[in-house]
Amino acid sequence: MENLKKMAGIKAAEFVSDGMVVGLGTGSTAYYFVEEIGRRIKEEGLQITAVTTSSVTSKQAEGLNIPLKSIDQVDFVDVTVDGADEVDSQFNGIKGGGGALLMEKIVATPSKEYIWVVDESKLVDKLGAFKLPVEVVQYGAEQIFRRFERAGYKPSFREKDGQRFVTDMQNFIIDLALDVIEDPIVFGQELDHVVGVVEHGLFNQMVDKVIVAGRDGVQILTSRKEK
């Protein structure tokens, strides 16, 4: 599995060229993309500027001497490469297993090209088997939790080291065990209107390409948005 992730990450780095502003994703597959960008800077003299989607990725990039700017210091991002936890046939996805969904979506939005790198196990007919993360402000988080409970969404607060997990933006994450999301667009809109929800892990019709590594090699899926 790790080898598949590495294959996808290295393939994605081929979409990066000199002079670009590059969004560096977060997670186990995006990790290999960041490593490959670091290698190309060191060995090939690749010249780029990068923005990151989490403190974890910032630390990795700094260790590789990748030049960084904050998202507010750039007008746009040429290409962002990130992982995904699930991708359906309509190019909707669930992200945020690593807890960086808000920053990931902020960087994805001004990106001219948005690419996901996944292994083939992440491709699904319908989203929902992977728990859907919802980032909420700390104030009133229990109210939101109970609302989700009443709706039958089987919520749970994400924890780390026995404490509630706190995101880089100092928010909590409530994971929803939905099993199946029949209409990700409609459900995303519902979550958008819940007061106290900062962001959710549904990335609907945002991605341009999905690089999939499988036993038969690497394939690139292109969304209708890109065609």
Curated annotation (Swiss-Prot):
Its annotated pathway? Carbohydrate degradation; pentose phosphate pathway; D-ribose 5-phosphate from D-ribulose 5-phosphate (non-oxidative stage): step 1/1
- What InterPro entries has UniProt attached to this entry? NagB/RpiA_transferase-like, Ribose-5P_isomerase, Ribose5P_isomerase_typA_subgr, Ribose5P_isomerase_type_A
Pfam families assigned to the protein according to its UniProt record, in alphabetical order: Rib_5-P_isom_A
Chain positions recorded as substrate binding sites:
T26, G27, S28, T29, D82, G83, A84, D85, K95, G96, G97, G98, K122
Keyword Isomerase assigned: yes
Catalysis: reaction(s): aldehydo-D-ribose 5-phosphate = D-ribulose 5-phosphate
Q: Which SUPFAM superfamilies match?
A: D-ribose-5-phosphate isomerase (RpiA), lid domain (SSF75445), NagB/RpiA/CoA transferase-like (SSF100950)
Matching entries from CDD domains are given as:
RPI_A
* GO MF term (any one): ribose-5-phosphate isomerase activity
Assigned keywords, A-Z = Isomerase
Cleaved signal peptide residues: none
The entry describes its oligomerization and partners as: Homodimer.
Summary of the function given for this chain in its UniProt record: Catalyzes the reversible conversion of ribose-5-phosphate to ribulose 5-phosphate.
Family, according to the entry, reads as follows:
Belongs to the ribose 5-phosphate isomerase family.
Would you tell me the protein name for this molecule? Ribose-5-phosphate isomerase A
Organism of this sequence: Streptococcus pneumoniae (strain Hungary19A-6)
